[in-house]
Amino acid sequence: MIILPSAYLAPVGFYALMLAHGREVRTEQWEHYVKQTVRNRAVIATEAGRMNLTIPVEHNGGKKMAMRDVKISDHGNWRHLHWQALRSAYEHSPFFEFYADEMAVFYEGRPTAYLLDFNMQLQETVCQMLGMDCPTLLTESYQAEGDFTDLRNGSTDGLTREVPYYQVFADRHGFMGGLSIADLLFNMGPESLLVLKDMIIDS
């Protein structure tokens, strides 16, 4: 079993592991929420370089919360800003228009209250876009340790390798690794699966 954190437009390496390990993958829902991590932050490539897209969450008076209980805040009109950032970054990529309508629903449609639900629904849609079966299994309880591969720190180092692929701004910045799945999807479209397969390090 592999345990991953819930992630907003998760890094490409997460999807490589989901493709390779399928139903062995679980998403952690019981851990204490860790702010400013993949749980509420995606990294995309822009004309100026890397850009963080961070979902604001409601605070709980400094008390620790389980990931499954974290609510999204509507502060700052973030949905509109994130969609505008994605559009600006990828509107000239080969496959943006192909996937834009399905992706826009998450930013222009009915708001989702909980961060975990939003991340999982977005993950399921991205998997459908990629044409891959996606594990949507959640952990049943919190386990500090056990017979599983613990990737809750958000790193897939040692299990995935960096595989360069076409990026719109590569002529300015070179290849930027470790980005959100949105970067791979909008740049490579159906060929994204080939990149994900190449990323897996055989054990």
Cite the ranges covered by each PLM segment:
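Residues lining hydrophobic/aromatic ligand-binding pockets adjacent to catalytic sites
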Residues: 1-203
